[in-house]
């Protein structure tokens, strides 16, 4: 197995449907709204900075075109490792307004894709 790390901005096409959990956080509102899921804002535990996050499951169909906008990885803070994606087209239709969202690196590693020429 070879390590493949797409460059930021490279266009990728999903070769299989990809299902993943999305954290209800303001940076993910576009994909949450696109899928018709009600956004549930983050709650804080009273008197602390501890957060209670809500997640919802989302699926992008095979053929969806997306790119990577950001990698976030910090040593010693693995629970925050994430990749931000931008969806450019679904079902062969270019989106007028791109969907931008982030998922954990573990969720991103489950995506099957190929590079778009």
What are these regions (language model features)?
Residues 73-88:
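Short aromatic-glycine-enriched beta-strand elements
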Residues 91-117:
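Intrinsically disordered, low-complexity, charged/polar segments
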Residues 18, 72, 91-93:
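Residues that cap or initiate secondary-structure elements
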Residues 49-72:
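Conserved beta-strand/loop element in small beta-rich adapter and peptidoglycan-binding domains
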Residues 6, 60, 79-81:
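A short, structural micro-pattern
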Residues 12-14, 66-68, 83-87:
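Hydrophobic beta-strand residues in large extracellular and virion-surface proteins
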Residues 9, 61-63, 96:
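Extracytoplasmic
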Residues 1-51, 109, 114-117:
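SH3-family beta-barrel domains
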């Amino acid at each position: 197995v070879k390590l493949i790390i797409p460059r930021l901005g490279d266009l990728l096409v999903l070769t299989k449907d990809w299902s993943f959990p999305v954290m209800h956080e303001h940076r993910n509102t576009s994909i949450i709204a696109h899928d018709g899921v009600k956004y549930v804002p983050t709650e804080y535990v009273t008197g602390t900075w501890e957060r209670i996050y809500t997640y919802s499951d989302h699926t992008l169909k095979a053929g969806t075109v997306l790119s990577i906008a950001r990698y976030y990885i910090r040593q010693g803070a693995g629970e925050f490792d994430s990749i931000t994606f931008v969806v450019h087209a679904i079902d062969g239709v270019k989106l007028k307004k791109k969907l931008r969202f982030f998922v954990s690196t573990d969720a991103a590693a489950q995506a099957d894709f190929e590079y778009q020429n």
